[in-house]
């Protein structure tokens, strides 16, 4: 509440400005109330201008609608004892509020005159009305937005050449608020015009509309396979296996099995506590005894494609058949008699064998849609270019390997960027270090689950693009093609051949695979975490109480899963392979003095050996030469090796012949499998770096021996130039050199390994962005140091 100027003078205080008056209250926090309205009942005093409805949020928010707040409510209030009976009882209007802001004395809504006072704060108006300040703020905000909209007017025709109408201003205002100028960077957009509710999950736009489907959790899921052989085989996956062939007569057992040892009776629980459960699973199963169903993310074909295939290859939908009192269910596309002719065209099979063949073909027709989707995954994700792109994206997601080295060198965190439909977004709120905060089984489960969700999100994005881009003409062309090939498809012997034929027609050979290099999108860790939370919420599993992961409910083997979950099984197996192939679980050996370079090391084919300075000596030398030289040609052009130039060339560095997409071949264990020469990124010739080092060494030697002045080491303050003896009468001679060994500075080399330059904990690695592989004593640059007989560190001569 605000205090009047007279009240301030009565207490011996100076009148305050309108903006400050709202913060000045009595000792009890409010103005005194008349005795006839508020008797002394022991309750806190209420403000005089507050009615029974004053608990609304508008009373404290400082924001009101354009009509000035609650005018209708205030105008109908009864006259208070302190309300004058003169013209001051007139209600507040926008015009009176404007007059107050200009310095005129006008009555407020409550009926008290505002007293003008020429205080040293420059306050021109004082008011007791709590709504006047809010109304003024509202008008100022609306005027600011409208002014920005008019300045940003780029309508056709221009706004200044057309009549200034309400419709024209409204259109420009909507354009200014909801369609900002794309030339303005997103990080510089005015925050006052951003209306997305904080932390709200946006509705999926331009994406697959079927998100997930509820199904019973099989007892053979990954959460019930702790300590089993099938889980160990999945964790040690070394090859990207093909989709198995569908054989008739294979039995599927999705029960708990004999491989695991439960510690309680089975009862009706879907998630059984086991002896080999991790601490996370023990706690989750104890709190998740009620879980029976899970919301598995959808991995089907686009709805338009699936509907067309069902109508052409199986039978039409019932609602599309003309309805009537005697109308029967739609017939299959091939009745039993015609199907018998397709299965046995020569008529040589016995009746029993023919019936069996028809039954088998019918079962194949039922399972073909599920097997067909998995077949499509195999044809897309097993492409070498798709594997390479997926590993690059996952390195960005986990801030691993070459992405971490770029951050150390160029001070750019690429893990914060995400792409979608050709648009790049920067998310500075992303946390890319979550996977590095865990270890052991917790880290493995988290990384595998993140890769599994990444594959699901990638497939749903591709199917969403296909669903939106496909036209009715294309659907009709598909319908004609499958109608023409329907008999030949049914004549195939195995479901594997049938599914392959259908996928080949749908994908037009490798047409979809040709489009997949645009996918997957770069995905950051916050997107994966939000997707994980979304799936768990849809499954009614609070992660704060039961810390399950979506991949915990997926079986590990096709033989232990019903056909409805085969697509989930395939993606989970792919996630295990990509986890091992990308080296995301690599940990350095624990030593007393950790190597700072281990923060950015990765053993996978994308990084080692060509992108890792630990293995690539020319790359290591080039890292040390960044920002240390500048070459100027005769025509005035200059060349300088900057971090940005190096980072761009480093991202493009890739050797296809040393890349093994379908097998886990890490360089430290299989050096013989890599044959390409190790080179730098920008300076391909090592002679250039050698010449630069010689020039730099000569320059430093010249300045140290013949230059004037005293040169000190910038790190230790140690004097580098020889100092003459200043005693009187002493003969001038060269000063004794400081105790240098084969290092650039410091005492003699100790037999113990050198300690880390900086703390190497994960938190320090995230906060201190030091340049990778660039110790201060090995840096080239304007800092001058005296060197030993060996002008350069030993690392360069190896």
From Swiss-Prot:
Xref: InterPro entries: L4
Map out region (Binding to host EIF4G) in residue numbers: 309-376
Q: Where is the composition biased (Acidic residues)?
A: 33-49
Any one GO molecular-function label of the UniProt entry: RNA binding
Where is it chiefly localized? host cell
Q: Where is this region: Disordered?
A: 1-123, 740-798
Q: For this UniProt entry, what's an example GO CC term?
A: host cell
Question: Where does the record place it?
Answer: Host cytoplasm
Concerning PTM, the database record says: Might be cleaved by the viral protease.
Gene Ontology process terms (BP): intracellular transport of viral protein in host cell; symbiont-mediated suppression of host gene expression; symbiont-mediated suppression of host translation initiation; viral translational shunt
Top-rank taxon of the source lineage equals: Viruses
Concerning what turns on (or off) its expression, the entry says: Expressed in the late phase of the viral replicative cycle.
Residue span, RRM domain: 379-497
> Which keywords appear in this protein's UniProt record, sorted alphabetically?
Chaperone, Eukaryotic host gene expression shutoff by virus, Eukaryotic host translation shutoff by virus, Host cytoplasm, Host gene expression shutoff by virus, Host-virus interaction, Inhibition of eukaryotic host translation factors by virus, Late protein, Methylation, Phosphoprotein, RNA-binding, Translational shunt, Transport
Q: Which Pfam families match?
A: Adeno_100
Q: Where is the composition biased (Polar residues)?
A: 86-105, 789-798
Function text = Protein that inhibits host translation while promoting late viral translation by ribosome shunting. Blocks host cap-dependent translation by binding to eIF4G, displacing MKNK1 from cap initiation complexes and preventing EIF4E phosphorylation. Binds to the tripartite leader sequence of viral late mRNAs and recruits host eIF4G, PABPC1/poly-A binding protein and 40S ribosomes subunits on viral mRNAs, allowing ribosome shunting and efficient translation of late viral mRNAs even though conventional translation via ribosome scanning from the cap has been shut off in the host cell.
- Quaternary structure, from the entry: Monomer. Interacts with hexon protein; this interaction allows chaperoning and trimerization of hexon proteins. Interacts (via N-terminus) with host initiation factor EIF4G (via C-terminus). Interacts (via RRM domain) with viral mRNAs that contain the tripartite leader; this interaction allows ribosome shunting and expression of viral late mRNAs.
Please give the family membership noted in the entry. Answer: Belongs to the adenoviridae shutoff protein family.
- Further remarks about this protein from its record: All late proteins expressed from the major late promoter are produced by alternative splicing and alternative polyadenylation of the same gene giving rise to non-overlapping ORFs. A leader sequence is present in the N-terminus of all these mRNAs and is recognized by the viral shutoff protein to provide expression although conventional translation via ribosome scanning from the cap has been shut off in the host cell.
This chain's protein is named Shutoff protein
Source species: Fowl adenovirus C serotype 10 (strain SA2) (FAdV-10)
